[in-house]
């Protein structure tokens, strides 16, 4: 499912003394089946933009098109349930939203709230629990007996049970250890490929943006500063650092190598294998 934002703007408490501009003239599209990342310093508007993708927030200017549904600023919207069923959002620390007596009931809550029968919701719960790397026996347990990592997966299963066509991820690995972060990100990527999802990742991890995204949207102060492939975005690491962002370790090491040997490699490398291949001729000559 394609998403398109055109001249999108948003103000909190518009036309009041407390009006605050959060988004201004945002123009970006996310192709159906694509994997995109949104990056930017804290306060750049990433999470505000994210909440427009399933109409949790309504634009105060411009419009957003999600599939065949168009949301225009100032136009009253009806039947938003259909849109929200198609666009699933995994927020930071989603396990904080768990509340039911059992894992099964928690996973079933979303689908049943959107009109799915209890029987079908239970079938979905059995399916998605495996998709998030857990087993069926966990369905009868209280979510509050589980480890933090398991609770995170159960909360994600609740989003997947609604069978969304778009998956929006807002810092989905926040608070996890490195191993847990990698497992969760690989899980999302596999789901993205297997289900043909349109995936939008909001992240502070430049490693994840470089590794998974086909396109990166760079934001600053509520506006889109640049849109490009990971290679294009990370080709100017100094500009990202000036914005208060980090760069992938491979990109940082490439910069150190180029300065040390006073050379310019033929491309911005995003993996160790790419960097090794690019450096090999210079290392063979002893840095000539």
From Swiss-Prot:
Its EC number is 7.-.-.-. InterPro entries: AAA+_ATPase, ABC_transporter-like_ATP-bd, ABC_transporter-like_CS, ABC_transpr_CbiO/EcfA_su, ECF_ABC_transporter_ATP-bd, EcfA2, P-loop_NTPase. Pfam families: ABC_tran. It comes from the Bacteria. It is found in: Cell membrane. GO terms for cellular component: ATP-binding cassette (ABC) transporter complex. It is an enzyme of class 7 (translocase). PROSITE patterns: ABC_TRANSPORTER_1 (PS00211), ABC_TRANSPORTER_2 (PS50893), CBIO (PS51246). PANTHER family: ENERGY-COUPLING FACTOR TRANSPORTER ATP-BINDING PROTEIN ECFA2, HEAVY METAL TRANSPORTER. ATP-binding (A) component of a common energy-coupling factor (ECF) ABC-transporter complex. Unlike classic ABC transporters this ECF transporter provides the energy necessary to transport a number of different substrates. Forms a stable energy-coupling factor (ECF) transporter complex composed of 2 membrane-embedded substrate-binding proteins (S component), 2 ATP-binding proteins (A component) and 2 transmembrane proteins (T component). This is Energy-coupling factor transporter ATP-binding protein EcfA2. It comes from Listeria monocytogenes serovar 1/2a (strain ATCC BAA-679 / EGD-e). The lineage of its organism: Bacteria, Bacillati, Bacillota, Bacilli, Bacillales.
């Amino acid at each position: 499912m394609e998403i398109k934002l055109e001249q999108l703007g948003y103000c909190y408490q518009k036309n009041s003394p407390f009006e605050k501009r959060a988004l201004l003239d945002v123009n970006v599209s996310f192709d159906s089946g694509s994997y995109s990342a949104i990056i930017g310093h804290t306060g750049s508007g990433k999470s505000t933009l994210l909440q427009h993708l399933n109409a949790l927030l309504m634009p105060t200017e411009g419009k957003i098109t999600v599939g065949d549904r168009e949301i225009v600023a100032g136009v009253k919207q009806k039947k938003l349930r259909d849109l929200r069923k198609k666009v699933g959002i995994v927020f930071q620390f989603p396990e904080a939203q768990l509340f039911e007596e059992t894992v099964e009931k928690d996973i079933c809550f979303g689908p049943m709230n959107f009109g799915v029968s209890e029987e079908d919701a239970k079938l979905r719960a059995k399916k998605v629990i495996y998709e998030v790397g857990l087993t069926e026996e966990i369905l009868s347990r209280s979510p509050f007996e589980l480890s933090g990592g398991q609770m995170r997966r159960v909360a994600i299963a609740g989003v997947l049970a609604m069978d969304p066509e778009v998956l929006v991820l807002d810092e989905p690995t926040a608070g996890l250890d490195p191993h847990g972060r990698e497992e969760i990100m690989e899980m999302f990527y596999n789901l993205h490929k297997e289900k043909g999802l349109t995936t939008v990742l909001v992240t502070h991890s430049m490693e994840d943006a470089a590794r998974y995204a086909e396109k990166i949207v760079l934001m600053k102060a509520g506006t889109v500063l640049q849109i490009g492939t990971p290679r294009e975005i990370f080709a100017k690491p100094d500009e990202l650092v000036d914005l208060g962002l980090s760069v992938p370790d491979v990109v940082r090491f490439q910069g150190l190598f180029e300065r040390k040997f006073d050379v310019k490699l033929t491309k911005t490398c995003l993996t160790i294998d790419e960097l090794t291949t690019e450096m090999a001729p210079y290392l063979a000559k002893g840095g000539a």
